[in-house]
């Protein structure tokens, strides 16, 4: 049975001190509640060690926001999957639309990043999704299929079952546009069918597919009620405990 998961992606926000305080505040709030999902926060690299040493990672699981596509070496500014894993971190976001758009990460580069993550026992939260031009042209299914096939389908079934997927329609992030629950469910069904075609029904059914397009306290419940939406990848709304809790409690 697949898990319900809510992931907070802090992006490039919060100083170290602010981040440690926020993580601890979230942990304390969750201790007082019975929630029906796993809660993960993916924080800046600079915060990982301090937060790992501060919180109970059985209550709030911890992830990074990226890892390098190389093992080690002369790659100034990069952080390897092995370095992240050595902290004790369990998860890493890969393929986020901002990494694709601003840093030129291609499907082939991302395949290498996923490979590095899996080899170091990190669980990839792998992002896929189309931009507005592709949605308007009706090409969203083609784009998403290509992202999945080129980045992920060289992995064995045993490796693939460790991966979490997150659909983020780029056109619905910070644009004032929103994907309807029907549009979201349609895409999640399509994604699951791609997995069925390649890995079979069992693995498709156990793969968590999250939604990452401006999911907030106001729309989380109507999104999460869809049978193929297994949670959310949350950006700005994860930076305030009360707001983030409202999304977590939408399950």
From Swiss-Prot:
Catalytic activity, EC: 5.3.1.1
InterPro entries the record matches: Aldolase_TIM (IPR013785), TIM_sf (IPR035990), TrioseP_Isoase_bac/euk (IPR022896), Triosephosphate_isomerase (IPR000652), Triosephosphate_isomerase_AS (IPR020861)
Molecular function terms, GO-annotated: triose-phosphate isomerase activity
Metabolic or biological pathway: Carbohydrate biosynthesis; gluconeogenesis; Carbohydrate degradation; glycolysis; D-glyceraldehyde 3-phosphate from glycerone phosphate: step 1/1
CDD domains: TIM
Keyword Cytoplasm: yes
Annotated keywords: Cytoplasm, Gluconeogenesis, Glycolysis, Isomerase
Superkingdom, natural source: Bacteria
GO cellular component: cytosol
Record-linked PROSITE patterns: TIM_1, TIM_2
Reactions catalysed: D-glyceraldehyde 3-phosphate = dihydroxyacetone phosphate
Active site (record annotation): 96, 168
Primary localization: cytoplasm
Any GO BP: glyceraldehyde-3-phosphate biosynthetic process
Function recorded in the entry: Involved in the gluconeogenesis. Catalyzes stereospecifically the conversion of dihydroxyacetone phosphate (DHAP) to D-glyceraldehyde-3-phosphate (G3P).
Assembly and oligomerization: Homodimer.
Family per similarity comment: Belongs to the triosephosphate isomerase family.
Record-linked PANTHER family: TRIOSEPHOSPHATE ISOMERASE (PTHR21139:SF42)
HAMAP family in alphabetical order: TIM_B
Entry protein name: Triosephosphate isomerase
Annotated organism of origin: Azobacteroides pseudotrichonymphae genomovar. CFP2
């Amino acid at each position: 049975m697949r898990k319900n998961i809510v992931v907070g992606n802090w992006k490039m926000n919060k100083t170290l001190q602010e981040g440690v305080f926020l993580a601890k505040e979230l942990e304390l709030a969750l201790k007082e509640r019975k929630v029906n999902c796993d809660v993960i926060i993916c924080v800046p690299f600079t915060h990982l060690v301090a937060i790992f040493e501060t919180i109970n990672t059985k209550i709030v699981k911890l992830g990074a926001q990226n890892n390098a596509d190389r093992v080690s070496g002369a790659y100034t500014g990069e952080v390897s999957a092995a370095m992240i894993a050595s902290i004790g971190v369990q998860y890493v976001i890969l393929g986020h639309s901002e990494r694709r758009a601003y840093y030129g990460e291609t499907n082939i580069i991302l395949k290498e990043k996923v490979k590095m993550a899996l080899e170091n026992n990190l669980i990839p939260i792998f992002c896929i999704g189309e931009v507005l031009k592709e949605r308007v042209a009706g090409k969203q299914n083609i784009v998403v299929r290509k992202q999945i096939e080129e980045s992920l389908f060289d992995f064995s079934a045993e490796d693939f079952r460790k991966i979490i997927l997150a659909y983020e329609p780029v056109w619905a992030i910070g644009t004032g546009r929103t994907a309807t629950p029907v549009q979201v469910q349609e895409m999640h069904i399509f994604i699951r069918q791609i997995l069925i075609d390649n890995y079979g029904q069992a693995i498709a059914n156990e793969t968590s597919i999250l939604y990452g397009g401006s999911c907030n306290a106001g729309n989380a419940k109507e999104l999460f009620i869809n049978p193929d939406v297994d949670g959310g990848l949350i950006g700005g709304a994860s930076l305030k405990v009360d707001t983030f809790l409202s999304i977590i409690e939408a399950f």
